[in-house]
Amino acid sequence: MNTKTTNFTFAFDKKNLNLAETIIKKYPPNGKRSAILPLLDLAQRQNGGWLHISAIEYVANMLEMPYMRAYEVATFYSMFNLSPVGKYHIQVCTTTPCWLRGSDDIMKICEKKLAIKHKETTKDQKFTLSEIECLGACVNAPVVQINDDYYEDLNEAKMEKLIEQYLNDL
């Protein structure tokens, strides 16, 4: 889906609007822009795991900041997805420690088992496969993040088993 041409208007639902207002109150009145990360995350979670352009604009307006500043934040951090992702977003860390411990093999297993490549989503919208920069768990490399869960000390067999579990919806 092209996020620039889709007619879609984002707004927090009542529950998330209350949560957003609570988050904003944690910051001083002149520093509410600092709530940008948690509010973008909240918007992404409400929107099925990705940020539509209108969600970024909505958050920017809520924080009384220029849209471009919010967009810069959303595009800088790899935790934000600017296009739809599958139900299970598999992110393989490929930075040096993980690469040295076999992240290339982990990526190949994912591609083979799911029949997709990096930055693709399965036809049933169940899986999206991505590379991600350091997840901060280098001591337990290689590491994969699936949605909010980390899986560490992986090898090909462990990754195959993990994918099977997700194929069966755990």
Swiss-Prot record:
Keywords: 2Fe-2S, Iron, Iron-sulfur, Metal-binding, NAD, Quinone, Translocase. Its cofactor is [2Fe-2S] cluster. InterPro entries: NuoE-like, NuoE_dom, NuoE_N, Thioredoxin-like_sf. Its EC number is 7.1.1.-. [2Fe-2S] cluster binds at C93, C98, C134, C138. Binds 1 [2Fe-2S] cluster. It comes from the Bacteria. Gene3D superfamilies: Glutaredoxin, NADH-quinone oxidoreductase subunit E. One of its GO terms (molecular function) is metal ion binding. Pfam families: 2Fe-2S_thioredx. The keyword Nucleus does not apply. It is an enzyme of class 7 (translocase). It catalyses: a quinone + NADH + 5 H(+)(in) = a quinol + NAD(+) + 4 H(+)(out). NCBIfam families: nuoE_fam, PRK07539.1-5. NDH-1 shuttles electrons from NADH, via FMN and iron-sulfur (Fe-S) centers, to quinones in the respiratory chain. Couples the redox reaction to proton translocation (for every two electrons transferred, four hydrogen ions are translocated across the cytoplasmic membrane), and thus conserves the redox energy in a proton gradient. PANTHER family: NADH DEHYDROGENASE [UBIQUINONE] FLAVOPROTEIN 2, MITOCHONDRIAL, NADH DEHYDROGENASE UBIQUINONE FLAVOPROTEIN 2, MITOCHONDRIAL. Belongs to the complex I 24 kDa subunit family. This is NADH-quinone oxidoreductase subunit E.
